[in-house]
Amino acid sequence: MGGLAWGPSRAAGSSWVNASGTWEQPLRGFSGLQGGRRRGRGEKGIPEEPLCQLTPQLGLSLRVPFGLGDYGLDMPGPQPSAASQTTGAVACLAEVLLWVGGSVVVSPRWQLSLVVERCMSAMQEGTQMVKLRGSSKGLVRFYYLDEHRSCLRWRPSRKNEKAKISIDSIQEVSEGRQSEIFQRYPDSSFDPNCCFSIYHGSHRESLDLVSPSSEEARTWVTGLRYLMAGISDEDSLARRQRTRDQWLKQTFDEADKNGDGSLSISEVLQLLHKLNVNLPRQRVKQMFREADTDDHQGTLGFEEFCAFYKMMSTRRDLYLLMLTYSNHKDHLDASDLQRFLEVEQKMNGVTLESCQNIIEQFEPCLENKSKGMLGIDGFTNYTRSPAGDIFNPEHNRVHQDMTQPLSHYFITSSHNTYLVGDQLMSQSRVDMYAWVLQAGCRCVEVDCWDGPDGEPIVHHGYTLTSKILFKDVIETINKYAFIKNEYPVILSIENHCSVVQQKKMAQYLTDILGDKLDLSSVSSEDATMLPSPQMLKGKILVKGKKLPANISEDAEEGEVSDEDSADEMEDDCKLLNGDASTNRKRVENIAKKKLDSLIKESKIRDCEDPNDFSVSTLSPSGKLGRKAEAKKGQSKVEEDVEAGEDSGVSRQNSRLFMSSFSKRKKKGSKIKKVASVEEGDETLDSPGSQSRGTARQKKTMKLSRALSDLVKYTKSVGTHDVEIEVVSSWQVSSFSETKAHQILQQKPTQYLRFNQHQLSRIYPSSYRVDSSNYNPQPFWNAGCQMVALNYQSEGRMLQLNRAKFSANGDCGYVLKPQCMCQGVFNPNSEDPLPGQLKKQLALRIISGQQLPKPRDSVLGDRGEIIDPFVEVEVIGLPVDCSKEQTRVVDDNGFNPMWEETLVFTVHMPEIALVRFLVWDHDPIGRDFIGQRTLAFSSIMPGYRHVYLEGMEEASIFVHVAVSDISGKVKQTLGLKGLFLRGTKPGSLDSHAAGQPLPRPSVSQRLLRRTASAPTKSQKPSRKGFPELALGTQDAGSEGAADDVAPSSPNPALEAPTQERSGSSSPRDTRLFPLQRPISPLCSLEPIAEEPALGPGLPLQAAAPTGPSQEGSQCPVGLGAKVTSSQQTSLGAFGTLQLRIGGGRENEEPPLRPHNGGISSGPREGTSGRQTDSKSRSRVPGHLPVVRRAKSEGQVLSELSPTPAVYSDATGTDRLWQRLEPGSHRDSVSSSSSMSSNDTVIDLSLPSLGLCRSRESIPGVSLGRLTSRPCLASAARPDLPPVTKSKSNPNLRVAGGLPTAPDELQPRPLAPRLTGHHPRPPWHHLTLVGLRDCPVSAKSKSLGDLTADDFAPSFQGSTSSLSCGLGSLGVAHQVLEPGIRRDALTEQLRWLTGFQQAGDITSPTSLGPAGDGSVGGPSFLRRSSSRSQSRVRAIASRARQAQERQQRLRGQDSRGPPEEERGTPEGACSVGHEGCVDVPMPAKGAPEQVCGAADGQLLLRL
């Protein structure tokens, strides 16, 4: 019998035989060849017999080198016929040479085209084969490889075009009768040589086929393995392009309903509906005519369809981004690309040569490529490539330190690895071990029990699961353990066998695993410490019980404690074999009905995965009662079954499945209890049972010496007190999820210290009979290494697990943070790591691409176009858990635009995960579309694509900015959170670390869905913008003693600040101090709204809607002076408030200055305009909102001579200058040059400004910064422009802008005001009154407070209060005479009572235009459904808060009281260290908005 084996090394010039019988260069990695007879040792190594001339009896066997496992591809020879002999020989040779661990590299001279083409041609022609199913009858189907060689298809099938298996999804192709399906058939049913199985998909489903002949079976196995090998060798860029090409072809074929090879206009329209494209029919027809180039025949061929798809999918967001960095050219040159990569993508060491290589690689246009230019197509290709993916490509390989002790790593672990389904009746399969090991799992579980014929078996004890041989399991583990990586595998043995079969187990382990068990070569410097993964490469560690040291070495066995036996079901859930086997069918039928009832009920709830079912933890509270009932005696099984149908089938009693199941078993069959006996209980029919009232008996078991000696570093021990310091690190403690959660809640710091020195394993509760998974994150927070999950249950928890371990090349080991390995902290604390810098993650969700319809859509592709929104969740420490979502975009799943920023604060980013979810909004809930979960440490900064997991083209485009922050962070929860401080939805506290919550009723869930889903036409409230608060700034801060600000000319304004300056009460919280001077406020405002740009459309500057005043309109200036004794220099620290300005829907919006000033002029031209989000998405000229976080400098008073100085948005030394309004600044970036103390987040495009030293800034000695003026037109001759530099790379040189001068010229912010009323002091400001709620608000159902529950009341025209969250000010209003309302209540009503016309996305935009007439066109009030009782509760709480404030401060209140819960989301605030003057505008004058720094009076609630 000839064979292929590894022989001695060959000389460099040696050769091998090729397919034609001549010798060529060998494959890399092979060191020798033995085939037929042993080859000669001549000069050219020519054998006596060519390898291709195989005898019919010849078989081949491949032994793979160490680290790749032993494939043992034993292939029997072909039949004697000459034709089949040649075909079989070629197939065998190709298989042997090509399938080496799924990857092969061939010499250029090696000619395999003939072999490959023969296999591919045969597969594409197709073969009729029998598909085996679980039933006894197979299905005859015709299987073939598609023309693109990307999918295996078959017919006939009811699935039509969905009847396919992608080559990418195939995990393994195995020959013979190896699958579980084949085992159900008698051995004589099929010829093993004609059988093979294809394992595919995330659940490792098997397709079991029987071919007509062994040659055809071998051809299919060879061809599929070849395709899989090519895919594994394919780089990520080529794979992405191939996937896209295949997707386009597949989409074209599916759209071609009549099969004529072209698409008509009707077929194109149907395809667009399927792709969730909502375009006007005329626009579609126009693009159709432009793409139809072959004499305009009215149809599109494939090439024409590709052109049509390209026109349709041109990315506007990428085009605007390209214009930004190309100086508004339609291409990027190498220098532009270099600047983009350095500034936005935060890449280091970018050279012009590397940029030129990118252009060569991604630019499809030959003309552009020859000129060294990257056009929009090339730029799109680059951003959609792996280089533009959000996942760090460095994390695709092992990059962490692997030399630390094992206890310093998280280790991915599997629970009941052998099961394919639930814990009661599912199948046990050997290939589950192959799947999880290849998926990166490093700890697998084997439940061993005594089997027939002296052979130990593996199955879930006391259940109806099927059984497999222990020997087969060990052989599979040996074969697949180190295919993906060589880091150690931990074999968790749950031993329930007798001593005799334990010896058999030890023999199999030793014989099969061999050297993999030999740990003598592993030496550790410290005997008390565990070895490292690097030292244990290629080793298998047996985790199990070990005989104590006091037992004689000659003893063959001994007794050990069985208390630590993990994963056993509760006593009342055990069904032993024996007499119960006669009633197996009856019990199985009952169990199936119960499980079906549970699964049907679980489908009702919101579910990210339709296959992700969950059965809540079943309370064992009735345990004693059930046991007592079981003692009443036995009765007939038939009677019990009939009596039990009524009690258990109903939905309300379905949760009692375990108890009723236990009851039936105990009554209807001989159920034995094992050794554990609870006090006062009696076992049934069990010899040696305890008498009533005896204490709990300690469980012991006998252990074989041979099996004990295989355990070294991973000795299983019983659970003990985590406060006791462990003596040895060579042991593993197992905790159920319930016990571990209890310890985590009671002793978190001790548990963390415990896990620093030894291993701990967490396993699911025994009540998770449906194999559902718990949340692993709380146990990772405590440093638990092996958090075992049910790999067969795909869903959220497994997605978190995959994301966790993808951060280190999927090797199964992830290094813990340093603080978890040394020292202790409380992971449940609100500030677990005080004094350490935190990370702030700013995610701007820009757009989506090719989002499909939900998988479980009733109408499928014919369903309505989706209304998507994005939800982002941060999962980590409890204090870090939060969840935010964007608004809903109506009727657009192809290219929706969100342009919204979500901000998260993370205390420990090393263990945090970030989860992106896309939902389809539905009137009664939401439908899951897709998700992508990543480790925080794996996220790349800059503009990135987030590809949804398991989807070919679906992605969302985001911008990522990560910055360091310090100080105490509190997430603002909005107006709702001000009064209802419940647990955050994303926090771990909300679900008790994975413990199921009581299930709400259907009506409650429907109400929750309706209330929680974001409104289609309104942006959801943002809760992610943090309020960063610190205590009082140290009086000795830098510069505090050098420069003193001049005293305020208004003593009345100084008093409040001086009074607060020494306060240290919890209410006197300050927004975090900056180490560099910035202006007091930082907010997000729309900067420019631009029309859609095409290649032929120049950028147009937006024009103001109102008349200008001397060429510009600017906000009224105020004298905002820093008078705090603690902060009196240039370093005086203002408050930072992040605020979202709602995007306007008007086509010609008023201009906004960069400093947040309000564009003035009458609003009659725009007040009546309103469009909802649906109509906006259909208007080609829709103007997207471009937001920037900017420092809004303090505005000078009219008498101040201080020159204007423009501060940088990032708090650095750069200066701001305003570009012309149409220029695009669409980015979120965090300056890498910021120091660790820079706590300002730059939510803008690359900063536009000149780098200037502080000394050169005019007016620095006065200790104040002023905001820059606004522009109504780009033609202001008095403004010095900014030149293009590295700090402002996106500046374009426009026609009217001269070169920037060397110095900035001082100029006033606004003309002097005349004719207005004197400014009242802060504590004498008149508060504005509102009418009582209308009748329509009194019949509202309970729910959250919205911005529409109150109607405004406008009276008077003299005095006004300017306060607001949006860009409009409040008109002149006074209280109704004779009505006195408390201040805080009125402010709350004012903040929640209005909506700005034309801005349907902002619920808190305040203030009418012009004369402020009641019910003017500038305001909208939408009807909603809320309860009047909530209004009264809010007002009562407001009054109580005010009374508390008055008691603390006395009756002389100087302003609205502060609510100790902090500022509501979206509200503005005034820093305690500064005061403002509020000028009163003249009657009849254009609206002027006054306030602190932003032209607004900012109220802190």
Curated annotation (Swiss-Prot):
Chain positions recorded as Ca(2+) 4 binding sites: D920, H921, D922
Positions with a binding annotation for Ca(2+) 3: I865, D867, D891
EC assignment: 3.1.4.11
Location relative to the cell: Cytoplasm; Cell membrane
Chain segments carrying region Disordered: 28-47, 551-570, 609-700, 986-1073, 1089-1238, 1273-1305, 1398-1469
Region (Necessary for plasma membrane localization): 75-229
Keyword annotations of the record: Calcium, Cell membrane, Cytoplasm, Hydrolase, Lipid degradation, Lipid metabolism, Membrane, Metal-binding, Phosphoprotein, Repeat, Transducer
Chain ranges of the EF-hand domain: 243-278, 279-315
Regulation: Activity is stimulated by GNB1:GNG2.
Protein name in UniProt: 1-phosphatidylinositol 4,5-bisphosphate phosphodiesterase eta-2
